[in-house]
Amino acid sequence: MFDYKLLSALAAVIEQAGFERAAQVLGLSQSAISQRIKLLEARVGQPVLVRVTPPAPTEIGRRLLNHVQQVRLLERDLQSLVPALDEEGLPERLRIALNADSLATWWAGAVGDFCAEHHLLLDLVVEDQTVGLKRMRAGEVAACVCASERPVAGARSLLLGAMRYRAMASPEFIVRHFPQGVRAEQLPRTPALVFGPDDFLQHRYLASLGVDGAFEHHLCPSSEGFIRLTEAGLGWGLVPELQVREQLERGLLLELLPDKPIDVPLYWHHWRNGGQLLGLLTEHLARLSAQWLVPWEQP
């Protein structure tokens, strides 16, 4: 039998990105958390954590985290059927990974009523849409929104739709860098904005225009900051259509190539044995996502 106090300590260290915060969340001393991790490692006969900053799970650690995540979800179902088992009486909580652009645009509208109706608290982890699935694979989250269709073992994926991005820049930037009009081959020689090192959307966009290779760019790991820097004329960027309607209407931003958007598919990944609440949320997102996302057409 598993000792779930030990597994909870492992989950807390990963979810809170360190021993100190894990101790605060569990109401224990940092040394007590460390002792539980050591005891767990002694019982499984191998390390469950890589001692880096932040700590990372080993292969067996990931398997244990997957187990903990699914047990938590099943326990929630049982507590809803037998309320007396819920000794703490706390609201439900789901840990979900999603990309910053979804969080900045459609996510709140899609889940707001659901969370209120089901007294659900969310623990959101922001990851680029191309790498969010690693959180599922590590057993750190109950579900994720990402651009990959293929689910991890033990999970399912559901196509929600696609986020449409358009290449935008300020009027001043366009006048300064494209006085004769915008041509695709000029884009690599003008400063761009990229969300982070895992963001390859600009590379895909340029490739779709027949332009390959390196390009000048700023890194800006903030969805809101990305828009502000684009408005300020620091570079051109691919921004969600949902996020810049007001800027377009006010003339703060202009589209570089109006007939050349790029769509990014968004899939909802969730554990196959995730329990009733996660199943209800999945059905809810399947019904509502089309209000914000465009249909995805495979290239």
Curated annotation (Swiss-Prot):
Record's keyword annotation contains Ribosomal protein: no
GO molecular function, one term: DNA-binding transcription factor activity
PROSITE patterns the UniProt entry points to: HTH_LYSR
Record-annotated HTH lysR-type domain positions: 2-58
InterPro entries, A to Z: ArgP (IPR017685), ArgP_gammaproteobact (IPR023490), LTTR (IPR050176), LysR_subst-bd (IPR005119), Tscrpt_reg_HTH_LysR (IPR000847), WH-like_DNA-bd_sf (IPR036388), WH_DNA-bd_sf (IPR036390)
Primary role: Controls the transcription of genes involved in arginine and lysine metabolism.
Quaternary context: Homodimer.
Family, similarity comment: Belongs to the LysR transcriptional regulatory family.
Name used for this protein in its record: HTH-type transcriptional regulator ArgP
